[in-house]
C-alpha cells in the first residue's frame, strides 16, 4: 500500500492482539480464506476442476470466477470457503485471451488487421447457440486486439475483453466482415482481472504441496500456491478503517466517515470499494457514497454502503454503540 495514493484521515494504529496479517494466518485458516489460480487443462469442465480442488484441499466449498469451456485452457481462479464471497466481484473483471482463428479463405495480413481494428470498442453480440444463457443481443466492449502471428489461413491473436464476451462468436464475426468466414480453432485465457498465467499452478502442483504439508509439516509450497483472498480485491479502490470500526461492519453496519483511517484517492461516489483493516485484512466490499475528498474532509456521514461482509464477527472487539450517525 503506497501511502501517497491515500488521504490520511486519521493516522491510527492497530492492536496486535486482534486479527491477523493475511500472510501470517495459521495454515487451516489461510486455506479457508484463500484462492488458487489453476492452469485449466483441455478436457475437463470448469466445474470438474473446481470439484477436484475441493477434494484435494478437503474443504466444503469452492467457487470459480469465469467459466471456461472444456476445450479452453488457461487461467481459472478458484476461491475457497470464506473467499467464495469474492467470486461475484472477480467475475466482472476484464479477461485476456490468446486465440487461434482459422479463416475459411485466403486473406492478406493487413486486411485482417484492418478488420480487427473495427472490432475494438463497443460491439453487439448474441450468445452462440450452444451457450446456456438467453439468446438476447448484448453490448460488450473489446479493449484491445492484436494480431500476433499469421501463417496461411491460421491467425493467432491476443484480445482483451469485457467479461461475458464470446470469443467464438467474435471469430465468426471477424470472418464475416473479412468476407472469408472464420472459426475459433483454439483458445487460451491468459488473464482474468489481475490474475495472469504467471500466478497459475497445475492441479498436480496443488496436490503435491498439500500432501507435503500434511505429511511433512512443510507449509512453504502450499502458501506459494494459495493466495490470501485479499489479493482478489487488489484492483478495487480501498478504504482502510480503524480497529474500532471493524466489528460494527461485521454486524451489518454501514461505514461511517468517523471509522475511516485512510481512503484511496481514486475512490469515487457509487464505485465498488474494498474495505480493509490496518493489518490489510479484507473486512467487506461496499459501494462508496462519497468521493474520496468528501470522506477525507467530512466529520459526519456514511462513507460506504456495505454489500458483502467478508470477515467473521468477533475478530475485533465490540467498541461501538447502536445509534444513528
Curated annotation (Swiss-Prot):
GO annotation terms (biological process): box H/ACA sno(s)RNA 3'-end processing; mRNA pseudouridine synthesis; rRNA pseudouridine synthesis; snRNA pseudouridine synthesis; tRNA pseudouridine synthesis
GO molecular function, one term: RNA binding
Gene3D superfamilies: Pseudouridine synthase, PUA domain
Keyword Zinc-finger: no
Domain PUA: 236-311
Record keywords, A-Z: Isomerase, tRNA processing
EC number, as in UniProt: 5.4.99.25
Coiled coil ranges: none
Catalytic activity: uridine(55) in tRNA = pseudouridine(55) in tRNA
Top-rank taxon: Archaea
PROSITE patterns cross-referenced by the UniProt entry: PUA
Keyword Protein transport carried by entry: no
Active site: 69 (nucleophile)
HAMAP family: TruB_arch
Task performed by this protein: Could be responsible for synthesis of pseudouridine from uracil-55 in the psi GC loop of transfer RNAs.
Protein name (database record): Probable tRNA pseudouridine synthase B
Lineage: Archaea, Methanobacteriati, Methanobacteriota, Archaeoglobi, Archaeoglobales
Gene this protein is translated from: truB
Amino acid at each position: 500500500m503506497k501511502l501517497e495514493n491515500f488521504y490520511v484521515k486519521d493516522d491510527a494504529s492497530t492492536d496486535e492482539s486482534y486479527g491477523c496479517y493475511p500472510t501470517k494466518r495459521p495454515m487451516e485458516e489461510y486455506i479457508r480464506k484463500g484462492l488458487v489460480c489453476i492452469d485449466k487443462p483441455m478436457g475437463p469442465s470448469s466445474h470438474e476442476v473446481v470439484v477436484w480442488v475441493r477434494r484435494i484441499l478437503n474443504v466444503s466449498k469452492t467457487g470459480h470466477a469465469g467459466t471456461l469451456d472444456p476445450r479452453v485452457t488457461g487461467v481459472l481462479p478458484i476461491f475457497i470457503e470464506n473467499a467464495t464471497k469474492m467470486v461475484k466481484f472477480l467475475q466482472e473483471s476484464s479477461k485476456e485471451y490468446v486465440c487461434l482463428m482459422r479463416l475459411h479463405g485466403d486473406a492478406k495480413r493487413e486486411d485482417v488487421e484492418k478488420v480487427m481494428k473495427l472490432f475494438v470498442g463497443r460491439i453487439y453480440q448474441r450468445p452462440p447457440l450452444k451457450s446456456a444463457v438467453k439468446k438476447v443481443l448484448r453490448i460488450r466492449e473489446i479493449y484491445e486486439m492484436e494480431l500476433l502471428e499469421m501463417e496461411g489461413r491460421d491467425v493467432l491473436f491476443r484480445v482483451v475483453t469485457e467479461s461475458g464476451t464470446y470469443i467464438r462468436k467474435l471469430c465468426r464475426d471477424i470472418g464475416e466482415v473479412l468476407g472469408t468466414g472464420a472459426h475459433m480453432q483454439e483458445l487460451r485465457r491468459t488473464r482474468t482481472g489481475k490474475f495472469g498465467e504467471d500466478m497459475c499452478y497445475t492441479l498436480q502442483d496443488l496436490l503435491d504441496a498439500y500432501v507435503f504439508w500434511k505429511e511433512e509439516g512443510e507449509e512453504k509450497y502450499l502458501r506459494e500456491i494459495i493466495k490470501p483472498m485479499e489479493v482478489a480485491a487488489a484492483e478495487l479502490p480501498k478504504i482502510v478503517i480503524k480497529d474500532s470500526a471493524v466489528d460494527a461492519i461485521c454486524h451489518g453496519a454501514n461505514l461511517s466517515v468517523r471509522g475511516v483511517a485512510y481512503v484511496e484517492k481514486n475512490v469515487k461516489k457509487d464505485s465498488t470499494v474494498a474495505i480493509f483493516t490496518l493489518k490489510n485484512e479484507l473486512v467487506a466490499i461496499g459501494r462508496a457514497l462519497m468521493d474520496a475528498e468528501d470522506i477525507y474532509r467530512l466529520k459526519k456521514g456514511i462513507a460506504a454502503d456495505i454489500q458483502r461482509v467478508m470477515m467473521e464477527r468477533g475478530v475485533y472487539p465490540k467498541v461501538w454503540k447502536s445509534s444513528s450517525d
